[in-house]
Regions:
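AMP-binding/adenylate-forming catalytic core of the ANL superfamily
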Residues: 1-69, 78-79, 84-88, 92-96
Length: 97
């Protein structure tokens, strides 16, 4: 799984690992959403275990990854859609994005 934004390759797992460093993030998944100028933009779906804001997560991302890789949109959800084996259904997340 790879997001191509403005000609740059962005690996969702790299962003997910940064977001999971925050103690108030229970789980997350990152996808690419179509963007008219850049091809795709990064969207993060986050399940909170405590109070955390998009601004806090954005600041965390800016500390650990390049600016162009950070999510442009944070969606807070109660749970991530998963199949019977516990794998996140990114196709469902793309529909929600």
């Amino acid at each position: 799984d790879m997001i191509i934004s403005g000609g740059s390759n962005i690996y969702p797992r790299e962003i997910e690992e940064v977001l999971l460093k925050h103690p108030a993030v229970a789980e997350c998944s990152v996808i690419g959403r179509a963007h008219p100028e850049w091809g795709e933009e990064v969207v993060a779906f986050v399940v909170r275990r405590g109070g955390v804001t998009a601004q806090e997560l954005d600041a965390l991302c800016l500390e650990h990854i390049a600016r162009f890789k950070r999510p442009r949109d944070y969606r807070f959800v109660d749970a991530l859609p998963k199949n019977n084996y516990g794998k996140v259904l990114k196709t469902e997340l793309r529909r929600l994005a």
